[in-house]
Amino acid sequence: MTDPTPSDVVLTSEQIAGLLPHRYPFALVDRVIAYEPGVSATAIKNITMNEPQFQGHFPERPLMPGVLIVEAMAQVGGLIVAQIPDLPKGLFVFAGIDGVRFRRPVVPGDQLIIQCELLSLKRKRFGKIKAEATVEGALVCSGELMFSLVD
């Protein structure tokens, strides 16, 4: 996956809120810059010092927790499946995480570019996405995320 230029807004934060169930402080996608429902999405997460996790992780050297980077990638994956026709309504949740690697710290002031691609969708209930997060073109996190539909 290659980084697109984050200039065009395909989905605003308000439109994202209409597609995902997450809300502050757990809404981790600021805008979508490339989107093909059922196939792929590229989104932006701006990392700011006023986010609540930095009060404790770590006050003297704030670092974005890796689990929140993975959650941001999962939310972008959720956008991919959010508009697939004939998909049952319900909540998609994590079912597994494979091969996730963290390559460098993410700090306030960084802009995560998150790219996700749907790898599989079985019985319209179980799926897998490939996800990558970069900052200024450098890979910071990658892996495969599995999800399942909860009725």
From Swiss-Prot:
SUPFAM superfamilies: Thioesterase/thiol ester dehydrase-isomerase. GO terms for biological process: fatty acid biosynthetic process; lipid A biosynthetic process. It catalyses: a (3R)-hydroxyacyl-[ACP] = a (2E)-enoyl-[ACP] + H2O. It comes from the Bacteria. One of its GO terms (cellular component) is membrane. Pfam families: FabA (PF07977). Disulfide bonds: none annotated. It is found in: Cytoplasm. The keyword Signal does not apply. Belongs to the thioester dehydratase family. FabZ subfamily. Involved in unsaturated fatty acids biosynthesis. Catalyzes the dehydration of short chain beta-hydroxyacyl-ACPs and long chain saturated and unsaturated beta-hydroxyacyl-ACPs. This is 3-hydroxyacyl-[acyl-carrier-protein] dehydratase FabZ. It comes from Synechococcus sp. (strain CC9902). The gene is fabZ.
